[in-house]
């Protein structure tokens, strides 16, 4: 039993996601599957919490069954918590301009259901091309939509200030989305992003 194993390591969260990459047309034809997905997450959340004291977290992914603000709020209505990946959220709900506040606004509205954060950022250049229809979902350039934390549309100093104001005391992880990087390149990116968050005093 997975939850028993998690308990043995004093783990309090179980991360889940639907993990289905698709285009809007495909998604529109999957309403029944989406309903079943909500039901599954709701049942899983109640069971793990009531039986083991483990909180099920839903990690939203862009181009999946649950990615928009409305879709995530339906999860929250089921009393589920979210692993809030600000990059995936902004890439699905925000625009391409520097200082886009979509992720900050959602975080502020639903902080009581967000104990866990993934730090990411979105390339404004790639996002703009996507929104203007210049990139197909399978265009290789879409693999570069996530960028280094200091280079994207999310203002991390504003994000830091919001977390301070909300007195966030949960977990935060720098997550790398660089599918074509070598191990060494990914490691260098991780060090760069860590140094940036330390420089702006988001972390120590």
Question: Which role fits each region the language model picked out?
Answer:
Residues 1-84, 91:
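Active-site acidic/histidine proton-transfer and metal-coordination neighborhood
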Residues 4, 10, 50, 69-204:
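Histidine-acidic metal/acid-base catalytic patches
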């Amino acid at each position: 039993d997975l939850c028993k194993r998690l308990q043995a390591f004093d783990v309090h969260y179980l991360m889940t996601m639907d993990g289905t990459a698709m285009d809007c047309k495909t998604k529109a034809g999957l309403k029944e599957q989406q309903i079943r997905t909500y039901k599954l997450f709701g049942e899983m959340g109640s069971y793990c919490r009531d039986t083991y004291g483990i909180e099920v977290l839903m990690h939203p992914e862009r181009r999946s069954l649950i990615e928009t603000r409305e879709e995530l709020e339906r999860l929250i209505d089921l009393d589920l918590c979210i692993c809030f990946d600000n990059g995936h959220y902004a890439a699905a709900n925000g625009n391409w301009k520097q200082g886009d506040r979509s992720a900050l606004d959602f975080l502020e509205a639903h902080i009581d259901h967000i104990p866990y954060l993934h730090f990411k950022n979105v390339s404004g250049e790639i996002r703009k091309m996507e929104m203007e229809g210049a990139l197909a979902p399978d265009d290789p350039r879409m693999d570069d939509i996530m960028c280094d934390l200091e280079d994207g549309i999310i203002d991390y100093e504003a994000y830091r200030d919001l977390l301070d104001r909300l007195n966030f005391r949960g977990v935060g992880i720098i997550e790398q989305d660089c599918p074509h990087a070598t191990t060494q390149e990914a490691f260098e990116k991780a060090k760069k992003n860590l140094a940036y968050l330390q420089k702006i005093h988001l972390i120590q």
